């Protein structure tokens, strides 16, 4: 098993590094949000600074503490690509998280189990898509993983270092708390109330630093941090993001988690045979909820929203069973075993709720995936050999499946990257227009170090929840304050082309030929309709500035530059 684990870990790490080698230095934004973070890194040492006054130009919302922007600003000086410094931080942070996961699992289950878990992490979709992007999530996760590892040691100096790592994790991304809470709950279970001094001291220091940030920013940090947590939740979209890739990306891990939670013949266990039987029945119920997803994966004939809902029901069953193991679980030691694994799963599933917030994505599954891998890895060293072998095989399948499927992700194909590179046409056209320029695409300005006047996503969400009415921006548009405006629309396919016999026409690439509907605005990050009308009443399209980007064969994005109408 050791040699197999080494091979799988080598495959996973090599694949991740090869992807990073291609994409870390890529000069264009790969996913929305990178350019906003790039602008934050610029504003560390430039006007208007981080946390500008809300309700005034520039309409920007800085959701997180300043640690990552400062670090990205420093590292970015050594990169020739706009995003290279920030992506390098994220790449190294993701690799560090995998190493720490390996070391944590190694303590209880051996190096082979640790390597399997580390390899599984690097081949999970959320890390393949977000583990190297210029976003705060990978750094926050790596700091939290350092904290978890340090808390496993008894030495005071090591635990102080771990508390510092947790501190910076939270002040990199405020919602990175699941690993922190599980770690201190485990410490409390092992050492009793004396262990509470660690989380309470960390809380006190965190609140003091929060007060310091509020003081030095005249309250702006508080307003920005609170505002970002008031955005609407869209549960249907959240279910889609969380569970549409369950089959085949996460199914082996899901089964492995159940096998890890089902009790074995541990010392002190109450009616172990009955508990095991009940556990397998509950696992069967949860897997039964997911059967529709398996059928949909093999023969896509039903509405994906339906099987996403059933997968959600399966996770509700898992949540209930994990809660039951917390209330009932016993083990040879107070801090390890099934009970703390139940806590890990409850925290993992609770952390997944944030993916329902509008604009959230798979990066909100980072902690959930890590906690599930910790459960599986810990069980390998605890349960009977036959079940430990099955869990190991499931992790190996998870690695091999992710290794194969990652090559099918369309956003990283060469032709997709070539499409992205064409964005330079918009940036080149903007060179003749002086600041200020308004853009619905942050990359059009941030990549050349030009200031953003507005964060499209946060501005739209603030408008939708009634915290910004847009009247000040409309007044600026009426006064033609901006020398140019970059507008963005999208176009989705409306149906498939058919021949005279009613058969779907298949192109040379083997895919059906689509026909497209009209150009529309993005409901999440396009400017509100009344602001769009103000643009059209005061600006006109600049000839020759249209740029259409094919995201997929069935989805297009278009950009245009508009200039003031002569008066």
Predicted regions and their residues:
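Transmembrane-helix motifs of polytopic, lipid-linked glycan transferases
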Residues: 85-108, 146
């Amino acid at each position: 098993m050791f040699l197999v684990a080494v091979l799988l870990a080598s495959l996973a790490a090599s694949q991740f590094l090869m992807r990073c080698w291609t994409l870390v230095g890529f000069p264009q934004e790969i996913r929305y949000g990178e350019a906003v973070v790039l602008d934050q890194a610029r504003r560390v040492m430039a006007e208007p600074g981080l946390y500008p006054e809300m309700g005034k130009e520039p309409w920007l919302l800085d959701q997180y503490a300043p640690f990552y922007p400062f670090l990205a600003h420093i590292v970015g000086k050594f990169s020739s690509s706009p995003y290279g410094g920030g992506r390098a931080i994220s790449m190294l942070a993701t690799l560090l998280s995998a190493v720490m996961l390996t070391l944590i699992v190694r303590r209880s289950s051996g190096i082979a189990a640790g390597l399997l878990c580390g390899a599984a992490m690097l081949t999970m979709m959320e890390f393949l898509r977000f583990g190297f992007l210029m976003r705060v999530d990978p750094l926050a996760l790596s700091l939290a993983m350092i904290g978890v590892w340090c808390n496993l040691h008894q030495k005071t100096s090591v635990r102080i270092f771990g508390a510092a790592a947790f501190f910076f994790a939270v002040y990199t991304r405020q919602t990175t708390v699941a690993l922190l809470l599980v770690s201190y709950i485990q410490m409390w279970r092992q050492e009793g109330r004396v262990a509470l001094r660690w989380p309470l001291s960390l809380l006190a220091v965190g609140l003091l630093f929060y007060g310091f940030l509020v003081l030095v920013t005249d309250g702006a940090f508080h307003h920005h941090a609170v505002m970002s947590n008031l955005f609407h939740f869209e549960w249907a979209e959240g279910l889609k993001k969380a569970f549409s890739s369950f089959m085949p990306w996460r199914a082996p891990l899901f089964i492995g988690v159940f096998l890890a939670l089902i009790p074995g013949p541990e010392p002190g266990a109450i009616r172990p045979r009955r508990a095991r039987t009940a556990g397998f029945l509950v696992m069967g119920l949860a897997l039964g909820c997911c059967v529709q997803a398996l059928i949909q994966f093999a023969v896509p004939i039903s509405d994906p929203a339906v099987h996403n809902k059933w997968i959600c029901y399966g996770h509700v069953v898992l949540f209930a069973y994990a809660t039951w193991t917390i209330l009932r679980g016993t083990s040879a030691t107070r801090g390890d075993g099934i009970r703390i694994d139940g806590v890990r799963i409850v925290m993992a599933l609770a952390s997944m709720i944030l993916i329902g917030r509008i604009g959230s994505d798979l990066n909100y599954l980072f902690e959930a995936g890590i906690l599930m891998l910790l459960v599986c890895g810990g069980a390998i060293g605890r349960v009977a050999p036959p079940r430990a072998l099955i869990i190991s095989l499931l992790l190996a399948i998870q690695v091999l499946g992710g290794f194969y499927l990652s090559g099918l992700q369309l956003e990283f194909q060469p032709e997709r990257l070539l499409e992205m590179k064409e964005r330079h046409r918009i940036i080149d056209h903007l060179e003749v227009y002086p600041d200020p320029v308004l853009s619905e695409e942050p990359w059009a300005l941030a990549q050349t170090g030009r200031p953003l006047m507005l964060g499209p996503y946060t501005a739209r969400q603030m408008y939708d929840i009634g915290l910004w009415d847009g009247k000040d921006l409309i007044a600026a548009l009426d006064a033609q304050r901006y020398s140019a405006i970059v507008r963005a629309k999208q176009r989705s396919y409306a149906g498939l082309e058919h021949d005279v016999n009613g058969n779907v026409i298949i192109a040379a690439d083997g895919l059906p030929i689509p026909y497209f509907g009209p150009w529309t605005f993005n409901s999440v990050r396009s400017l509100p309709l009344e602001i769009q009308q103000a643009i059209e009443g005061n600006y006109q399209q600049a000839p020759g500035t249209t740029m259409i980007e094919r995201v997929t064969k069935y989805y297009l994005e278009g950009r245009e530059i508009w200039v003031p109408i002569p008066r």
